[in-house]
Amino acid sequence: MRECISIHVGQAGVQIGNACWELYCLEHGIQPDGQMPSDKTIGGGDDSFNTFFSETGAGKHVPRAVFVDLEPTVIDEVRTGTYRQLFHPEQLITGKEDAANNYARGHYTIGKEIIDLVLDRIRKLADQCTGLQGFLVFHSFGGGTGSGFTSLLMERLSVDYGKKSKLEFSIYPAPQVSTAVVEPYNSILTTHTTLEHSDCAFMVDNEAIYDICRRNLDIERPTYTNLNRLIGQIVSSITASLRFDGALNVDLTEFQTNLVPYPRIHFPLATYAPVISAEKAYHEQLSVAEITNACFEPANQMVKCDPRHGKYMACCLLYRGDVVPKDVNAAIATIKTKRTIQFVDWCPTGFKVGINYQPPTVVPGGDLAKVQRAVCMLSNTTAIAEAWARLDHKFDLMYAKRAFVHWYVGEGMEEGEFSEAREDMAALEKDYEEVGVDSVEGEGEEEGEEY
């Protein structure tokens, strides 16, 4: 089996975890108590969903997941919620005091007290796997636990499980709904620390998700539940190929192979379509061509940036539901002629396509309409550097005045770490810039003279 272990860190990670596992259970027909009426084989079968669920002798399906937070309230909701019987109590790990939005607390002071316990639980899950393929880590950039503890965990996972893939789903801080003033500090510190440990990171910009909820679902004041259910759909689309048999089964390493041209440039942009409310879906066709076209609209992206200003390095389209290759090829051909999609000149303009015949599922009573087909596009584009530039700018404004820095230094960090992290981010922006520059024609001419 090619198992994946999901690790949900901090409030954002845990709440997205709730949305994802709720959706996975619906997709696979697993009840809140872990029983699965449709699954006739008792014990670990060789079904695709076993990559995400382990099976006990009693026929109970348990998520291969760990929930970690440095304070108990958020995970207590899981312990008392609808799906409390689904998880093993040891999978829900809480500390006593939170990281107080402080990266240094999550990474040094409080984080180090709980890290060994967390790694121990992850080890138990890993031991149940026959062929662990990697980890999916869910966290936010802005929180103390999400930023600090995640980066500590990623460092330790690299030591313990060297070659296993680590994919991140990171919540990028949104200006509208900021939960902390120091989000830019935390984001840049965590990105710097995890950059070399993460193989691929899907960023989700809260603001972009907010706008999609407002615009496409007519929700005036979206709550975190609305946001997380939408994020859940995206995560589900990305992981569907790992959990179902499809025409093109992508495993974790295949994502990297197709989306990551250089180790540092591993931040694909995710776009999902159709996001539509039930009353609207009734009147629309939502053909393959339409949903594919929607993926190239900046309005449907998970991060606010404009790919029309950047260049693509890679592009994957993951379809699910009633989709045939003929329609997909036609849709892509149309887009290639109509849209100005610029690829970097060193990359062939191929679109990688995955089709999964399992139609998208929606949470009953949720905001999204049940549709026949959906698509999630993962593209690696130089435009995502805009997101880093925004964050770096905010970091600079505060750091120029050394605002709030004493809180970090007081928890055992050194001021040098700030400037080091900021330099690394500047280098990352530069990397993106260089990738997009056309390869120098001059080089070829000089070689010609030598011969």
UniProtKB/Swiss-Prot annotation:
Description of how the protein assembles with itself and partners: Dimer of alpha and beta chains. A typical microtubule is a hollow water-filled tube with an outer diameter of 25 nm and an inner diameter of 15 nM. Alpha-beta heterodimers associate head-to-tail to form protofilaments running lengthwise along the microtubule wall with the beta-tubulin subunit facing the microtubule plus end conferring a structural polarity. Microtubules usually have 13 protofilaments but different protofilament numbers can be found in some organisms and specialized cells. Component of sperm flagellar doublet microtubules.
Tissue-wise expression: Expressed at a high level in fetal brain.
Post-translational modification, as annotated: Some glutamate residues at the C-terminus are polyglutamylated, resulting in polyglutamate chains on the gamma-carboxyl group. Polyglutamylation plays a key role in microtubule severing by spastin (SPAST). SPAST preferentially recognizes and acts on microtubules decorated with short polyglutamate tails: severing activity by SPAST increases as the number of glutamates per tubulin rises from one to eight, but decreases beyond this glutamylation threshold. Glutamylation is also involved in cilia motility.
Recorded name of the encoding gene: TUBA1A
Residues carrying Phosphoserine: S439
InterPro entries per record: Alpha_tubulin, Tub_FtsZ_C, Tubulin, Tubulin/FtsZ-like_C, Tubulin/FtsZ_2-layer-sand-dom, Tubulin/FtsZ_GTPase_sf, Tubulin_C, Tubulin_CS
Organism of origin: Homo sapiens (Human)
Disease: Lissencephaly 3: A classic type lissencephaly associated with psychomotor retardation and seizures. Features include agyria or pachygyria or laminar heterotopia, severe intellectual disability, motor delay, variable presence of seizures, and abnormalities of corpus callosum, hippocampus, cerebellar vermis and brainstem.
Reaction catalysed by this enzyme: GTP + H2O = GDP + phosphate + H(+)
Stretches for region Disordered: 432-451
UniProt record similarity statement: Belongs to the tubulin family.
Disulfide cross-links: none
One example GO MF annotation: protein heterodimerization activity
GO cellular component: axonemal microtubule; cilium; condensed chromosome; cytoplasm; cytoplasmic ribonucleoprotein granule; cytosol; extracellular exosome; microtubule
Native organism taxonomy: Eukaryota, Metazoa, Chordata, Craniata, Vertebrata
Residues noted as binding GTP in the record, renumbered to the chain: Q11, E71, S140, G144, T145, T179, N206, N228
Gene3D superfamilies the UniProt entry points to: Helix hairpin bin, Tubulin/FtsZ, C-terminal domain, Tubulin/FtsZ, GTPase domain
Highest rank taxon of the organism: Eukaryota
Protein known as: Tubulin alpha-1A chain
UniProt xrefs under PROSITE patterns: TUBULIN (PS00227)
Pfam families given in the database record: Tubulin, Tubulin_C
Key words, A-Z: Acetylation, Cell projection, Cilium, Cytoplasm, Cytoskeleton, Disease variant, Flagellum, GTP-binding, Hydrolase, Isopeptide bond, Lissencephaly, Magnesium, Metal-binding, Methylation, Microtubule, Nitration, Nucleotide-binding, Phosphoprotein
GO biological process, one term: microtubule polymerization
